[in-house]
């Protein structure tokens, strides 16, 4: 019995260019190549909690805050407590790329523009033609914690969504993670669908 030849998935380069101290390769046939981007996949409806079991919700000022809330109140306040987590196909392998949105009166999507966490009134786009975005976070499991999740900003490497107490409120912020044991950047995500 003869062995089957496996088709090579190689790229043939026909030219090299140096532009601004960066070497670029020109492919002979680039129709199968995909540019760096995020492509929207299916959403999941989820409740997000910090490690104090406080529920993330959108307050009247459209700000993301955490509050003690029984499950029955989560259901009663579903438009403010149920988040739509859209998963995105990422052309690079860096974790599960997601956006976090909420449908209250209008669709709003979480942003970390200028390292400030807020909701922008917008639908998550179907495609983002870039390697980073203020609305894309990498959802990852926390090593050693089976049910804990972290959300790292795609725009600010090493910065994570975190819970921080300010005055009497527990706010969602963006924080540089200095320590792997920092529990403020850990969350549980309870899928609803």
UniProtKB/Swiss-Prot annotation:
Residues the record marks as site: Cleavage: 36-37, 71-72
PTM field: The pro-IL-18 precursor is processed by CASP1, CASP4 or CASP5 to yield its mature, active form. The pro-IL-18 precursor features autoinhibitory interactions between the propeptide and the post-cleavage-site region, preventing recognition by the IL18R1 receptor. Processing by CASP1, CASP4 or CASP5 induces conformational changes to generate critical receptor-binding sites. The mature form is then secreted and released in the extracellular milieu by passing through the gasdermin-D (GSDMD) pore. In contrast, cleavage by CASP3 inactivates IL18.
Record-linked SUPFAM superfamilies: Cytokine
Keywords from the UniProt entry: Cytokine, Cytoplasm, Inflammatory response, Secreted
Cell compartment(s), UniProt: Cytoplasm, Cytosol; Secreted
Prosequence residues removed at maturation: 1-36
The keyword Secreted is annotated on this UniProt entry: yes
GO CC entries: cytosol; extracellular space
CDD domains per the UniProt record, alphabetical: beta-trefoil_IL18
Keyword Secreted applies: yes
Annotated InterPro entries: IL-18, IL-1_fam, IL1/FGF
GO MF, any single term: cytokine activity
Subunit structure: Forms a ternary complex with ligand-binding receptor subunit IL18R1 and signaling receptor subunit IL18RAP at the plasma membrane. Mature IL18 first binds to IL18R1 forming a low affinity binary complex, which then interacts with IL18RAP to form a high affinity ternary complex that signals inside the cell. Interacts with cargo receptor TMED10; the interaction mediates the translocation from the cytoplasm into the ERGIC (endoplasmic reticulum-Golgi intermediate compartment) and thereby secretion.
Entry similarity comment: Belongs to the IL-1 family.
Function: Pro-inflammatory cytokine primarily involved in epithelial barrier repair, polarized T-helper 1 (Th1) cell and natural killer (NK) cell immune responses. Upon binding to IL18R1 and IL18RAP, forms a signaling ternary complex which activates NF-kappa-B, triggering synthesis of inflammatory mediators. Synergizes with IL12/interleukin-12 to induce IFNG synthesis from T-helper 1 (Th1) cells and natural killer (NK) cells.
Protein name: Interleukin-18
Gene: IL18
């Amino acid at each position: 019995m003869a062995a089957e030849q496996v088709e090579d998935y190689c790229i043939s380069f026909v030219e090299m260019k140096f532009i601004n101290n960066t070497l670029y390769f020109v492919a002979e046939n680039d129709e199968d190549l995909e540019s760096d981007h995020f492509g929207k996949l299916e959403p999941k409806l989820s409740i997000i909690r910090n490690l104090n079991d406080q529920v993330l919700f959108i307050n009247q000022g459209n700000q993301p805050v955490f509050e003690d809330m029984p499950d029955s109140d989560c259901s009663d306040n579903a438009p403010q407590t149920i988040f739509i987590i859209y998963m995105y196909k990422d052309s690079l392998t860096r974790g599960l790329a997601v956006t976090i949105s909420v449908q209250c009166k209008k669709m709003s999507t979480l942003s970390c523009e200028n390292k400030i966490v807020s909701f922008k009134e917008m639908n998550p786009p179907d495609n983002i033609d870039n390697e980073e975005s203020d609305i894309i976070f990498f959802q990852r499991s926390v090593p050693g914690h089976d049910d804990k999740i972290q959300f790292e900003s795609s725009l600010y490497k090493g910065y994570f969504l975190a819970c921080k107490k300010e005055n009497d409120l527990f706010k969602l912020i963006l924080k540089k993670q200095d320590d792997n044991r920092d529990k403020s950047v850990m969350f549980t995500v309870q899928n609803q669908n």
